[in-house]
Regions:
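Bacterial N-terminal signal peptides
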Residues: 7-18
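Conserved blade-ending motifs and adjacent loop-strand segments that build the rim/top face
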Residues: 332-350
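Enriched but not universal
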Residues: 2, 7, 457-465
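Acidic, Gly/Ser/Thr-rich repeat motifs that build Ca2+-stabilized beta-propeller blades
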Residues: 20-168, 225-228, 233-241, 293-330, ...
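Surface-exposed binding patches on compact interaction domains or structured appendages
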Residues: 375-376, 398-426
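A short beta-strand micro-motif common to beta-rich folds, especially ectodomain repeats
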Residues: 437-447
Length: 465
């Protein structure tokens, strides 16, 4: 039975209207080099780890404004386009064992590597010792590398691998059960099997049957980002489309076939018309067309945070090309925010708050819009004939933006005349030789009016209130 499908249309529903007005982005850190992922270690430290495509993982301490290097493997990585250091996952017992895992494309031949690392006694610095778990050949095309790693509640490591690239998956890797390309894989990193540095979960769907034992689900084009709902443990996979459709698959289940390359979203592609039998596939719960500048989905997190920034269970995702951030509650969806960036990923902190990663170099937190109040001091000033300069102190909440403006040509505002949170507006007053003897002007700061009086007397009187 087909699951419910939805298209990204702006719906005039209470859900859409309320969410669009309810959230904003709070800058966390900038100056990064092509960040593609952010996440937490689950160790209670409050740290945020940020993956840069070129081969560096940086760590942001709780409450800090700058990052430090956690791991640098640039010498191992080929980066650019869809290649690079692409994924990071911490072992569920990282707090005690210091183990974590990375996904990258290897310099020289483009092979996809899933590798294990550890940390030094200083948990802010990783060991340089690498243990390669998987090496998946990807020699021909530079695109569709996948790149996501995440642990499920079952303790197994899930791995998202692209179909090998080029248009329309020419070798049909996504449907080939003897290939690891175009799949979600699942492995046990706490045990080993003969000839492997990992073990196979005994309930993987193709254990002891034709097909690679590592495969968990298949029929995917480029599952760049996926997430587990931290409450239900349901697996959501956002699959990047070809030329027409972007899709979200949920639940992604053991042995599920999600249709590529026979289907793109719920539409038969024409690549294999005889195979377009809906009974053989699981279809997306959500899909959208390539219009209005949209072209590539970036999944996605299910909001379960403590700050109540969004209703619990809301799925948040984006389009890399349009910069839009979307929200979906299972029945209705909306454009949550329209950003100017290229959103490469979402991440979560230990408390379930969602972070937005922009390939341009920033990480921001999705937060409930603040009810902002503003105050200024003083409220007025008086100047004599010679004019002069002054300043206005602005008091505002940390994430509350404000601007200052004047319509009087003899008042000149200094600096940017805008800010966020507490700040200062500076201004200059021109000499006055005209008529009448007194003139009055105003500066409006965040809705508050600051009044300036100037007269032709040479006595300067200044006061506030």
């Amino acid at each position: 039975m087909r699951t419910i499908r939805a298209t990204i249309a702006l719906l005039a529903l209470g859900f859409a209207a309320s969410l669009a007005a309810a959230v904003h982005l709070v800058p966390v850190v900038g100056g990064l080099a092509s960040p593609v992922f952010a996440g937490n270690a689950g160790d209670g430290s409050g740290r945020l780890f940020i993956v840069e495509q070129g081969g560096v993982i940086r760590v942001l301490q709780s409450g800090a404004a700058t990052v430090s290097v956690f791991l640098d493997i640039r010498s191992k990585v080929i980066a650019g386009g869809e290649r690079g250091l692409l994924g990071l996952a911490f072992h569920p017992q990282y707090a005690s064992n210091g183990r974590f895992f990375v996904y990258y494309t290897r310099s020289g031949d483009g092979t996809i590597i899933v590798a294990e690392y550890g940390t030094l006694s200083d948990r802010n610095i990783a060991s340089a010792i690498e243990t390669t778990l998987l090496a998946i050949p990807h020699p021909i095309n530079a695109n569709h590398n996948g790149g996501m790693l995440a642990f499920g509640r079952d303790g197994y490591l899930y791995i998202g691998v692209g179909d090998g690239g080029s248009a329309n998956d020419p070798p049909d890797n996504a449907q080939n059960l003897e290939s690891l390309l175009g799949k979600i894989l699942r492995i046990d990193v706490d045990r080993t099997a003969s000839g492997l540095r990992y073990a196979l979960p005994p309930d993987n769907p193709f254990v002891n049957t034709p097909g690679r034992d590592e495969i968990y689900a298949y029929g995917l084009r480029n599952p760049w980002r996926f997430t587990f709902d931290r409450v239900t443990d349901v697996l959501w996979v956002a699959d990047v489309g070809q030329n027409a459709r972007e899709e979200v698959n949920m639940p992604v289940v053991r042995g599920g076939n999600y249709g590529w390359r026979a289907y793109e979203g719920s539409s038969c592609t024409g690549n294999d018309p005889p195979l377009c039998n809906p009974a053989n596939y699981r279809f997306p719960v959500l899909e959208y067309a390539h219009d209005e500048g949209r072209c590539s989905i970036t999944g996605g997190s299910v909001y379960r945070g403590n700050r109540q920034s969004l209703p619990g269970g809301t799925y948040v995702f984006a389009d890399f090309c349009s910069g839009e951030i979307f929200a979906w509650d299972g029945t209705a969806q909306t454009v949550l925010l329209d950003t100017p960036g290229n959103i490469s990923s979402f991440g979560e902190d230990e408390h379930g708050e969602i972070y937005v990663v922009d390939l341009g170099g920033t990480v921001s937190r999705l937060a409930a819009a603040t009810s902002c109040t503003y105050a200024i001091a003083p409220a007025r000033e008086t100047f004599a004939i010679a004019g002069g300069a002054g300043s206005i102190a602005v008091t505002a909440g940390d994430s509350c933006a404000w601007t200052a403006a004047t319509g009087d040509a003899w008042i000149t505002l200094g600096g940017a005349a805008e800010g966020t949170g507490n700040g200062t507006v500076t201004y200059a007053i021109a000499p006055y030789t005209g008529k009448p003897k007194v003139r009055t002007g105003t500066i409006v700061v965040a809705g508050n009016t600051f009044t300036i009086t100037q007269n032709r007397l040479r006595l300067l009187v200044r006061g506030g209130g």
